[in-house]
């Protein structure tokens, strides 16, 4: 039985040898043929030469190097494109997702699950801000989007070959892999685990990238941000109508003069702000449509030297 590990890497020269040694020395994985697909996402350090050297000595190591930095989501998709295992497991090279969890994932898969999610029961290794923003994102996404995604589940999971082949059929270029992996469905099971500290290096995923990923997730799987502006427009129009009616009554019935520029200026600024926000939301969706219509490849792989 063949198990494929999909491992995106970006400037991870310190972590790769530790990860490789840990996988190959882990006794519970030795009964399986374990393929390791490294995806070098445009690293500037020795990452490329390290994974190429591993591939020379180990035929089950598949080294892929992008022509530039395309991002983690395209790297994950590239890994899925190039795996050959009966089951596929995306995993981070920093070993925050412990190798010891993999046999439990395999056990659930062999029991009949198409996808086995690895759920973090303890996120104390993440900062408080990251934990809270992740919690808010999951709640918002699952309230307005379909399908829902399991809270505290990252990319670390096991997928059957059938699930992987279904994912590869999807044509979109703007990728939110957590949503895509949930969208394909199938019989799903969950394994809980405790996330550990990184074995080496530092995280390359900063707050700005997380923010953009959250936007990608919401706009890829929900039209609610567009629909909500219809309701806002109706609300503002209703308030304006009622205020206008009150001004007429106040002037004709009570004889009060119409208030001048201050109220008008406030109204103009308020409506201008609302319109700009609405245009911004609309622009997010139009921008994604524009990128999709170009039909550019998700990634480019350079040949090995």
From Swiss-Prot:
<dbReference type="InterPro" id="IPR001173">
    <property type="entry name" value="Glyco_trans_2-like"/>
</dbReference>
<comment type="function">
    <text>Involved in O antigen modification. Catalyzes the transfer of the glucose residue from UDP-glucose to a lipid carrier.</text>
</comment>
<keyword id="KW-1043">Host membrane</keyword>
<feature type="transmembrane region" description="Helical">
    <location>
        <begin position="263"/>
        <end position="283"/>
    </location>
</feature>
<keyword id="KW-0808">Transferase</keyword>
<dbReference type="GO" id="GO:0033644">
    <property type="term" value="C:host cell membrane"/>
</dbReference>
<keyword id="KW-0328">Glycosyltransferase</keyword>
<comment type="similarity">
    <text>Belongs to the glycosyltransferase 2 family. GtrB subfamily.</text>
</comment>
<dbReference type="GO" id="GO:0016757">
    <property type="term" value="F:glycosyltransferase activity"/>
</dbReference>
<dbReference type="InterPro" id="IPR050256">
    <property type="entry name" value="Glycosyltransferase_2"/>
</dbReference>
<dbReference type="Pfam" id="PF00535">
    <property type="entry name" value="Glycos_transf_2"/>
</dbReference>
<protein>
    <recommendedName>
        <fullName>Bactoprenol glucosyl transferase</fullName>
        <ecNumber>2.4.1.-</ecNumber>
    </recommendedName>
</protein>
<keyword id="KW-1133">Transmembrane helix</keyword>
<keyword id="KW-0812">Transmembrane</keyword>
<dbReference type="GO" id="GO:0005886">
    <property type="term" value="C:plasma membrane"/>
</dbReference>
<keyword id="KW-0472">Membrane</keyword>
<dbReference type="InterPro" id="IPR029044">
    <property type="entry name" value="Nucleotide-diphossugar_trans"/>
</dbReference>
<feature type="transmembrane region" description="Helical">
    <location>
        <begin position="229"/>
        <end position="249"/>
    </location>
</feature>
């Amino acid at each position: 039985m063949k198990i494929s590990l999909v491992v995106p890497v970006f400037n991870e020269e310190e972590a790769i040898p530790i990860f490789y040694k840990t996988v190959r020395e882990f006794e519970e994985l030795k009964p399986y043929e374990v393929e390791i697909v490294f995806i070098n996402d445009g690293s500037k350090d020795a990452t490329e030469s390290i994974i190429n050297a591993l591939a020379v000595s180990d035929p089950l190591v598949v080294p892929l190097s992008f022509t530039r930095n395309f991002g983690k989501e395209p790297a994950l998709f590239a890994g899925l494109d190039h795996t050959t295992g009966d089951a596929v497991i995306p995993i981070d090279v920093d070993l925050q997702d412990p190798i010891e969890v993999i046999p439990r994932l395999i056990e659930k898969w062999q029991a009949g699950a198409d996808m086995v999610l690895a759920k973090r029961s303890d996120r104390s290794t993440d900062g408080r801000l990251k934990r809270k923003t992740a919690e808010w994102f999951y709640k918002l996404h699952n309230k307005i989007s379909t399908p829902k995604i399991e809270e505290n589940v990252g990319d670390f999971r096991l997928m059957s070959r059938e699930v992987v082949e279904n994912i590869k059929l999807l044509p979109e270029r703007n990728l939110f892999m957590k949503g895509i992996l949930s969208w394909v469905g199938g019989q799903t099971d969950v394994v809980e685990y405790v996330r550990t500290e990184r074995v080496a290096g530092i995280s390359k995923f900063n707050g700005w990238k997380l923010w953009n990923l959250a936007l990608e997730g919401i706009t890829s799987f929900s039209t609610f941000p567009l629909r909500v502006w219809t309701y806002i427009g109706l609300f503002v129009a209703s308030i304006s109508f009622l205020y206008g009616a009150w001004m007429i009554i106040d002037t004709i019935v009570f004889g009060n003069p119409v208030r001048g520029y201050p109220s008008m200026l406030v109204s103009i600024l308020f409506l201008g702000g609302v319109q700009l926000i609405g245009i911004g939301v609309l622009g997010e969706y139009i921008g994604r449509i524009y990128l999709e219509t170009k039909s550019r490849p998700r990634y480019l792989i350079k040949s090995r030297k």
